[in-house]
């Protein structure tokens, strides 16, 4: 597959090829590279409440909130648990004075609801990435979130799809 870089600088990125995620590395500025699909080397380990690659080790609680993101290269914990869990989905009442959806009151944090109703969690594998897909319900809304780790890239992606049916409630993902 031919991958074009429209930027004026070299870049590396993930691309989808035949339904699988591949890594296109060092594509020249305003140039192209040929990318061949690569099968997973199995270096990403996903278990019920953890995921790990050569860069990060993630640990989740029973509601799939992050309890730990350990950076293996820096040899340090990324999250400060004294301030809360990571990727904790929170809903807040939202009754603005003038402009619905444009104005958040400064007292919105007074009514917080945790989105902890996990209906399903499963390991997912997609080419050069793997992770955990979590389905949550909140009242009549559904949130599907996949947390991805990559074989050759030092990043964590939080891919989130929200079917939000609530009125006067806002949703956020909190990280300490």
Sequence positions of predicted segments:
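Catalytic and substrate-binding regions of extracellular carbohydrate-active enzymes
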Residues: 1-173
